[in-house]
């Protein structure tokens, strides 16, 4: 697993967001996902770059996955990447408790960082947003990428709020997307 400083040095490169394939019956196609990650890693090895790979971002359809499906996708990604590039797992959920649970799991299986959107159904106040990320930071040793996406979260984290957030979380925040 990378240190936060090493991750910070890689997040200003290309961020590859993996897609999650599904079977026609709606079940996650884990074998297809594994193939996709292997293909991506092979191309990165052929053409080395400063980059990260993110499972379970928006392109990975994270809101449509169960917690167990999200965890399995993250585990497979970390396993297949095998340290070739940093894995920044998408771990955002509709609640702080579930976000922390998925994020702790991602850390436990070897993800280098997490990418986290605000809870997206009941949008928190500014104080709630600060508390959400502070609670998450307190639970993790790995770096956090703040996914500032008002189209999906219903809220925009303004620069002054981001400054306060960085003060609250120490060096845990490695980037903002």
Regions found by a protein language model. Give the residues of each.
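Active-site/ligand-binding-proximal alpha/beta "capping" segment
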Residues: 161-177
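Active-site beta->alpha loop and helix N-cap motifs at the rims of alpha/beta catalytic domains
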Residues: 2-156, 173
């Amino acid at each position: 697993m990378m240190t936060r400083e090493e991750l910070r040095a890689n997040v200003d490169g290309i961020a590859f967001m993996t897609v999650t394939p599904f079977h026609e019956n709606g079940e996650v196609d884990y074998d297809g996902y594994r193939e996709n990650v292997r293909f991506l890693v092979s191309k990165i090895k052929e053409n080395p770059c400063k980059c990260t790979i993110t499972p379970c971002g928006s392109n990975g359809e994270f809101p449509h996955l169960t917690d167990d499906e999200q965890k399995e996708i993250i585990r497979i990604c970390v396993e297949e990447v095998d340290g070739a590039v940093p894995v920044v797992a998408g771990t955002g959920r509709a609640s702080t408790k579930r976000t922390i649970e998925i994020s702790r799991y991602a850390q436990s299986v070897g993800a280098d960082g997490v990418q986290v959107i605000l809870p997206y159904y009941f949008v928190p106040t500014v104080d709630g947003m600060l508390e959400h990320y502070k609670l998450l930071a307190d639970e993790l040793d790995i770096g956090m990428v703040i996914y500032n996406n008002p189209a999906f979260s219903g809220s925009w984290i303004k620069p002054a709020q981001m400054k306060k957030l960085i003060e609250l979380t120490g060096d845990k925040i490695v980037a903002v997307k």
